[in-house]
Regions:
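Gly/Ser/Thr-rich beta-alpha loop segments that engage phosphate groups in nucleotides
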Residues: 34-35, 66-70, 74-77, 104, ...
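Short, well-ordered alpha-helical segments in soluble proteins
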Residues: 112, 130, 134-138, 153-156, ...
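Anion-binding (especially nucleotide phosphate/pyrophosphate-binding) glycine-rich loop
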Residues: 2-130
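Hydrophobic, well-ordered secondary-structure segments
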Residues: 105, 109, 123, 127, ...
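A generic local secondary-structure boundary/capping motif
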Residues: 68-69, 109-112, 120-124, 137-144, ...
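Structural signature of FAD isoalloxazine-binding scaffolds in flavoprotein oxidoreductases
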Residues: 32-44, 70-88, 135-166, 180-187
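Phosphate/pyrophosphate- and phosphate-bearing ligand-binding catalytic cores of soluble enzymes
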Residues: 18-19, 25, 155-274, 278-282, ...
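A generic alpha-helix structural signal
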Residues: 5, 9, 46, 50, ...
Length: 301
């Protein structure tokens, strides 16, 4: 690790490398132990960082806005790369919008609206970035990334850039081919539909109101904790199992929306994980349905 640090500082003197960086600062759950090494690079720095990490046998974890993650209390070994503020450019040409992987979905939706382009209204309130949204085919209120993606540029494990069409991405409910192939999303190109800006903004405002009314936005969470089982709603199954408000330490099933697990203050990853397991067991016993986590678990628990 020290050798990697030495070499990366020589190769990229302007890159800031954080050591023992608390991951709770970088996840919307506000939990997670320290990352051994943490960087937030520019696009052109990525091949150098990844190449050196591979050469030194350093484990690499890539995150975006940290909005769909549960990081273990013992943190993450090796190197964490945040694709974020240094990679968030958004540009519009005609009905095509290009967004770098670190661009926030709210930023992308606002830019699309300003250009009179519809199709991203559903994403305005999703607290994620473009890279994560593509990776998990994020969606809400009847829309999903699959509807608007034209193509995506990724970095392969061999540090080669590759362009994937929508078909090649193999998009389905909360799934794409990105994770299993260990690709890193660099940029997404979206094909949007011209529409009056006023109509687009009205739709965005309507969906924002729904979120505020129905979701526990006042507490740290990772959004929907479980995937929607075929033919059911996770929140309804959890409520029917008598788990509204159920808590383990400072982790709690939201009383406002049972599909959300919230951090009431100082929850640990262990408490959240235990609560999720309890919910899965009770729901399985009550309804026979197996709930699958939508939240991605990384690091050491």
């Amino acid at each position: 690790m020290d050798q990697w640090l030495e070499e990366i500082r020589a190769a990229l003197p302007e890159l800031v490398v954080y050591q023992q960086e608390p991951m709770k600062k970088h996840t919307t759950f506000r939990v997670g132990g320290p990352a051994d090494l943490y960087v937030c690079p520019k696009k052109q720095e990525l091949p150098v960082i990844l190449g050196l990490a591979k050469k030194k046998g350093l484990a690499v974890t890539v995150i975006g806005n940290g909005s769909n993650l549960l990081v273990g209390d013992k943190g993450i070994r090796g190197l964490v790369i945040e694709v974020g503020a240094q990679m968030n450019a958004v540009e519009v040409q005609g009905n095509i919008l290009r967004a770098q992987a670190g661009a926030l979905l709210s930023q992308v939706a606002t830019k699309a609206a300003a250009a009179g382009l519809g199709g991203m209204e559903f994403a305005a309130g999703i607290p994620g970035s473009m890279g994560g949204a593509v990776t998990m085919n994020a969606g809400a209120y009847g829309g999903e990334m699959k509807d608007v993606i034209r193509q995506v540029t990724v970095l392969t494990p061999e540090c080669e850039q590759k362009v994937l069409s929508r078909e090649e991405l193999d998009l389905s409910y909360r799934h794409s081919c990105i994770s299993k192939n260990h690709f890193l999303v660099l940029e997404a190109e979206l094909s949007l539909t011209p529409a009056p800006e006023q109509e687009i903004r009205a739709k965005m405002a309507e969906l924002r109101e729904k979120r505020v009314e129905k979701q526990p936005l006042e507490y740290p969470s990772a959004g929907s904790t479980f995937k929607r089982p075929e033919g059911y709603f996770a929140g309804k199954l959890i409520m029917d199992a008598g788990l509204r408000g159920y808590a383990v330490g400072d982790a709690q099933v939201s009383e406002k929306h049972c599909g959300f697990v919230i951090n009431r203050g100082n929850a640990t990853a262990a408490e959240i994980l235990q609560l999720m397991k309890d919910v899965q067991e009770r729901v399985k016993k009550q309804s026979g349905v197996t709930l699958e986590p939508e939240v991605k678990m990384i690091g050491e628990f």
